[in-house]
Amino acid sequence: NLIQFSELIQCANKGKRATYYYMDYGCYCGKGGSGTPVDDLDRCCKTHDDCYGQAEKKGCFPFLTLYNFICFPGGPTCDRGTTCQRFVCDCDIQAAFCFARSPYNNKNYNINISKRCK
């Protein structure tokens, strides 16, 4: 669920960067994705896309799955749930922590995908 993913991102980065900055970044952060990731942050998004692909192969619906998590001072943790809920939550938490530790390059926000993502 994108709302929960947004909350996880804010928990992991302690509110340092608004979630919308990640929605149109590089070749993979946002809808779809193709080509070679432009940097570490974009690689986080590709890994997240791949994780959602694995969730779908397991019969889960990652964009619709609601899950439980707790935001601790050290970052988010998945709480109880079904196999699909735990899998999708783990995908989102891994991405949120990856975003938090990866540098953000303003030059890779809202790039020309047709030119840079081949």
UniProtKB/Swiss-Prot annotation:
It holds the Pfam family Phospholip_A2_1. The keyword Cell membrane does not apply. It is an enzyme of class 3 (hydrolase). The keyword Hydrolase applies. Coiled coil: none annotated. Its cofactor is Ca(2+). Gene3D superfamilies: Phospholipase A2 domain. Ca(2+) binds at Y28, G30, G32, D49. InterPro entries: PLipase_A2 (IPR001211), PLipase_A2_Asp_AS (IPR033112), PLipase_A2_dom (IPR016090), PLipase_A2_dom_sf (IPR036444), PLipase_A2_His_AS (IPR033113). Expressed by the venom gland. Its EC number is 3.1.1.4. One of its GO terms (molecular function) is calcium-dependent phospholipase A2 activity. Disulfide bonds join C11-C71, C27-C117, C29-C45, C44-C98, C51-C91, C60-C84, C78-C89. This is Basic phospholipase A2 2.
